[in-house]
Amino acid sequence: MKKIDLNADIAEGFPFDESLLQLLSSANVACGLHAGGAKEMQSAVKFAKENKVRIGAHPSFPDRENFGRTAMALSSQELIAHLRYQLGALKAICDGEGAVISYVKPHGALYNQAAKDEKIARLIAQTVYQFDPNLKLMGLAGSLMLRIAEEEKLQTISEVFADRHYMPDGSLVPRSQPNAMVESDKEAIQQVLQMVTKGQVNAIDGSLVPVKAESICLHGDNQHSLQFAKRIVEELEKNHIKITA
């Protein structure tokens, strides 16, 4: 039986976390610098533990104004400090709830920059390894960030996206472009099944791009995305694909 992990971002202040956590096998907990805060983090950890969902830290650039989606030119020391601050905050909450952090997935612009920028990717990997060498790093399948993480002796999780279109090089179509998102639920489900069962995805130019699908990113920031997440779960189960971290 094939297996796949389902992850989504939580503790970002949206009202669907509890419902979403009943569908997921992994939860990316926002650490307060792009959205959410201590209260949201603690609730998310509590719900994740109750639902036996694997917990990941979801650190970002310090950018609440733009939801962490704007690239920032931080010095190495600034980036390291912000990463340590966020990881430490989530660890303290997990310790208090008797839970553990299992992996780290950068958020938004930090995720996208690390997928292509060796310096940022290495700083993230080294900071995570120093914080806890047993943590895994989740990132875009086939990206530079995952290759650097493996060089830095971290285990990795290759992530694919249900609702994003892909470039021929395997990167995501930037959100600034009009065709960045997969708008049709039917198309997104077909894309998920193709990635999980065949290890490939159709790029926007029609070419087939190989992808290693270990975790599927879903979104749960509105009512439609929550319903879509339920449909993805149903389709995976219908195709005898087990959802597990």
Curated annotation (Swiss-Prot):
- InterPro entries cross-referenced by the UniProt entry: Glyco_hydro/deAcase_b/a-brl, LamB/YcsF/PxpA-like
List the residue ranges forming a coiled coil, or say none: none
Q: What keywords tag this UniProt record?
A: ATP-binding, Hydrolase, Nucleotide-binding
Keyword rRNA-binding tagged: no
- Is Mitochondrion found in the keyword set? no
Q: Which Pfam families match?
A: LamB_YcsF
Q: Recorded E.C. number(s)?
A: 3.5.2.9
Where does the UniProt annotation place the signal sequence? none
- A Gene Ontology molecular function term of the record: 5-oxoprolinase (ATP-hydrolyzing) activity
Instruction: Name a biological process GO annotation.
Output: carbohydrate metabolic process
Where on the tree of life does the source sit, at the highest rank? Bacteria
Q: Which reaction does it catalyse?
A: 5-oxo-L-proline + ATP + 2 H2O = L-glutamate + ADP + phosphate + H(+)
Give the quaternary structure: Forms a complex composed of PxpA, PxpB and PxpC.
Biological function:
Catalyzes the cleavage of 5-oxoproline to form L-glutamate coupled to the hydrolysis of ATP to ADP and inorganic phosphate.
Protein family = Belongs to the LamB/PxpA family.
Q: Know the name of this protein?
A: 5-oxoprolinase subunit A
Supply the source organism's classification.
Bacteria, Pseudomonadati, Pseudomonadota, Gammaproteobacteria, Pasteurellales
